[in-house]
């Protein structure tokens, strides 16, 4: 027997949480890329 939740609030909460997690993941990736760019510029600047 499968128990399913017929509650729309739970489903909406899960969708909101999923969207929130994807936004946070995207921000993390963007932050990592920006950090790498800064590290590369600092490395180039200090080696000149």
Curated annotation (Swiss-Prot):
Role description: In neurons, plays a role in the regulation of intracellular Ca(2+), possibly by acting as an activator of ATP2A2/SERCA2, thus increasing the efficiency with which Ca(2+) is removed from the cytoplasm. Inhibits differentiation of embryonic stem cells into neurons and inhibits neurite outgrowth, likely as a result of its role in intracellular Ca(2+) regulation. In pancreatic beta cells, lowers Ca(2+) levels in the endoplasmic reticulum and enhances glucose-stimulated insulin secretion.
Region annotated Disordered, chain positions: 1-20
A GO cellular component annotation in the UniProt record: endoplasmic reticulum
Transmembrane stretches, start-end: 24-44
GO biological process: endoplasmic reticulum calcium ion homeostasis; negative regulation of neuron differentiation; neuron projection morphogenesis; positive regulation of insulin secretion involved in cellular response to glucose stimulus; regulation of cytosolic calcium ion concentration
Tissue: In the adult, expressed in Purkinje cells in the cerebellum, in motor neurons and interneurons in the spinal cord and in neurons of the cortex, hippocampus and thalamus (at protein level). Also detected in the developing cortex, hippocampus and thalamus at embryonic day E15.5 (at protein level).
Localization per record: Endoplasmic reticulum membrane; Extracellular vesicle membrane
Basic and acidic residues bias (residue ranges): 8-20
Native organism taxonomy: Eukaryota, Metazoa, Chordata, Craniata, Vertebrata
Assembly behavior: Interacts with ATPase ATP2A2/SERCA2. Interacts with ATPase ATP2A3/SERCA3; the interaction occurs at low levels in low glucose conditions and is increased by high glucose levels.
Pfam families: TUNAR
Keyword Transport applies: no
Listed name of the protein: Protein TUNAR
Species this protein is from: Mus musculus (Mouse)
Topology of the protein relative to the lipid bilayer: Single-pass membrane protein
């Amino acid at each position: 027997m499968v128990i399913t939740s017929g509650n729309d609030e739970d489903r909406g909460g899960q969708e909101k949480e999923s969207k929130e997690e994807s936004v946070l993941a995207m921000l993390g990736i963007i932050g990592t890329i920006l950090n790498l760019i800064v590290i590369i510029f600092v490395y180039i600047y200090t080696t000149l």
